[in-house]
Amino acid sequence: GCGDHFFLASLQKAMADLGIAPYETAVISGIGCSSRLPYYMKTYAMQTIHGRAAAIATGAKVANPYLTIWQVSGDGDGLAIGGNHFIHCLRRNVDINIILLNNRIYGLTKGQYSPTSPRGFVSKSSPYGTVEDPFRPAELAFGARGNFFGRAVATDNQGVMELMKAGQRHKGTSVCE
C-alpha cells in the first residue's frame, strides 16, 4: 500500500505542532495514491495533472511567498512524468516541502513498475522483470543541488512527523521521503 493515511496523520500533527494556520497553507498533489490527500486537509488544496505538482507548487509559492506549501507525490508521479519539475524545483531551491510517497510501484494502476522499482522487479508491466536500475531519490535530490532530504518509514508516525517538521523549518526545498 501507499501509506497515505500515516502521512496524512503525521502532516496534520506536524502542522499543529508548528503552529501553521490552515489558511496560510496549501497542499498540492499530483495523480496517484497521494492525489486525494489534499481533500482531507483544511487548507487551500489542489489536485494537479499527472507529474505537474512541483511546477504548480512552485508557482503558488512564487505568487504568494507567505504560504506554507506542502507538495505530495508518489514515486511514479513525482519522479517519472514529474521528474523534470522535481529536479528544477530543487535546483531553484524554492521554499516548499515535497512529500515523496515512495512505494516503488504505481500502486493506483495496480502493479506498473515505477522509477524506483528494483532491477528485475516482476509486475504486470514487466512480466520478465525490469531491466533498468532504479532511481535513488536521495542521490537524485542532491545531484539536483537539493540541500534537504530526509527519509522515514510510513508506519513510524513520530518519525514521519519529526521529519516533516524539520523539512518545514528548513528554508528552501525540502524532500521528505
Question: Where do the PLM segments sit?
Answer:
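Active-site diphosphate/adenylate-binding microenvironment
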Residues: 1-49
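Conserved active-site and cofactor/substrate-binding residues in soluble primary-metabolism enzymes
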Residues: 3-10, 22, 51, 55, ...
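Generic secondary-structure signature for well-ordered alpha-helical cores
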Residues: 4-7, 13-20, 62-65, 91-94, ...
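Generic beta-sheet signal
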Residues: 25-27, 67-69, 172-176
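Thiamine diphosphate
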Residues: 29-107, 159-162
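Conserved thiamine diphosphate
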Residues: 66, 114-170
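Short catalytic-loop micro-motif centered on adjacent basic/acidic residues
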Residues: 71-73, 148-153, 175
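Glycine-rich, charge-decorated loop segments at or immediately adjacent to ligand/cofactor-binding or catalytic sites
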Residues: 107-113
